């Protein structure tokens, strides 16, 4: 009987999203234990000061869970551009754990509401989903925070693909590019996105929320890419 249980525990129940090797019973969350340990996690510190143009940055805290390394780039690429929407449920717990760690020393500043970074209509129709909104929906039960879908809209004239823009262009492209659809007076809002790079999109979204009365806006992203890193090359 013990031999059978040991054999059963080694049966594959899926594959690791990083190395593609079969997972055994007892390994869960989409990653094998070695790959989970090797994920390039970031320290629980604010990234706003690392913004390329800090004088233009808007928002209170910017937090991310993972550094933009090849394995993370591959995961985000599959999630964002190759229809792997199921990755939201795999990746959200990593972000949730990091967020809880980040606020451990500042519990009084815990946000009131989750909001997703919007994408253009053309991007939505091409992908069939907004990856940031999928992450936010998964974070909702993990962090016990309400989620307001559709609160932010991207204005049509600003629908340029930001992931292919140079860092300096992103700030110009994103200026006044977001619209908050209702008042959020006095609320502290957590803005959820997949990748933080220059901070241009985050700042534009934060400005839109602050114009409608938000008390403060924090940015929560799955990954952080240095502005000089060639993100498109990873795709």
Language-model features: where?
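Glycine-rich phosphate/pyrophosphate-handling loop used in enzymes and phosphotransfer proteins
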Residues: 1-192, 197-235
